[in-house]
Design a protein with these regions (language model features):
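Feature for exported/extracytoplasmic and membrane-associated proteins, marking the mature portion
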Residues: 1-180, 212-215, 219, 224-286
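Metal-dependent active-site segment of extracytoplasmic phospho-/sulfohydrolases and closely related
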Residues: 171, 175-202
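Histidine-centered active-site microenvironments of extracellular/periplasmic hydrolases
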Residues: 193-224
Length: 286
């Protein structure tokens, strides 16, 4: 399912501020002290996973969450890990943290992966193994870069085509590796802003406003493009340069939480306190 002409209520073109607003689920940067997925976990009581070396902002907060990423080429041997655990017996906090890390490592079971060969497909294989474990996380977040195509963007080939192909292969990998869990999974691909309608002088595009949001999953009512299309004529563009947003990305995210995780209106207000009046997008799931 694809939603087009989607944007945020915050219309700055700064990567940093726009990413903060998107991950906080707020209306301005640093307005909240937690991420909207973490507030979701506080509502559901589940556990979250950041596929990163440290917690992504979207999962930061009081809700239970942990971090995981594929191991580097020179991972510690089990015998060394056991020795370190013995050394830390006198420090319960450190010993508990290490034991938790080893538990996550064992669940992922991708320990032979080298840093050099770490593709998004390999990362998603490990992520899927964690998600399909019964006692594993309920929610996961992954940050994919490479979309800031100020130069040599290309069309059917080039930088943009490569990152889209990688995303496509990654989603296909996730679907395969999740197995039957895919039927109860929703994957949301969102971005902080789009690109300019016209190319720049370097064969790329600059920071824009509206873009597209993709939803995948076994229960998604797929095969549809949903948009209140604003047009691409000069007088239709936002500030004369960007695709104009006609749908708030938070409405789509609210719809996912409402239909997939069955959050009520008061709970949605707790997750997105700055967007209480925004109605959720409906009829996302079959």
């Amino acid at each position: 399912m694809l939603f087009h002409a989607v944007g945020q209520s915050y219309r700055d073109r700064s990567h940093f501020d726009s990413q903060v607003v998107l991950e906080e689920g707020s209306s301005r940067p640093h307005a909240l002290k937690s991420g909207w997925l973490n507030r979701t976990l506080q509502t559901t009581g589940g556990e979250g996973l950041s596929v990163s070396s440290e917690a992504l902002l979207i999962l930061q907060g009081a809700g239970r969450h942990f971090n995981w990423q594929p191991e580097p080429k020179f991972a510690a041997k089990p015998s060394f890990q056991s020795q370190v655990l013995e050394m830390l017996e006198g420090d319960p906090a450190l010993a508990t943290a290490l034991a938790e890390g080893l538990r996550v490592r064992e669940m992922a079971q991708v320990n032979s992966m080298s840093a050099k060969g770490n593709t998004i497909q390999q990362t998603l294989k490990g992520m899927a193994k964690l998600l399909r474990v019964p006692e594993g996380p309920e929610i996961a977040a992954l940050d994919l870069g490479g979309w800031d195509t100020h130069s040599r963007q290309g069309r059917e080939s080039g930088r943009f085509a490569r990152v889209f192909s990688e995303l496509s292969r990654g989603v296909a990998t996730l679907r395969t590796e999740l197995g039957s869990t895919w039927q109860d999974t929703v994957v949301a691909c969102v971005t902080e802003f789009g690109r300019t309608v016209r190319p720049n002088g370097s064969g790329g595009t600059d920071h824009g406003t509206a873009s597209a949001t993709f939803l995948f999953g076994g229960g998604i009512r797929g095969g549809r493009v949903i948009a209140d299309w604003p047009g691409l004529a000069d007088h239709d563009l936002y500030e004369g340069r960007d695709l104009r947003p006609t749908r708030d990305v938070v409405a789509v995210l609210k719809g996912v939480l409402h239909e997939h995780l069955h959050l009520t209106e008061p709970q949605l207000a707790e997750v997105f306190p700055a967007h209480r009046a925004l109605a959720p997008q409906l009829e996302i799931l079959s």
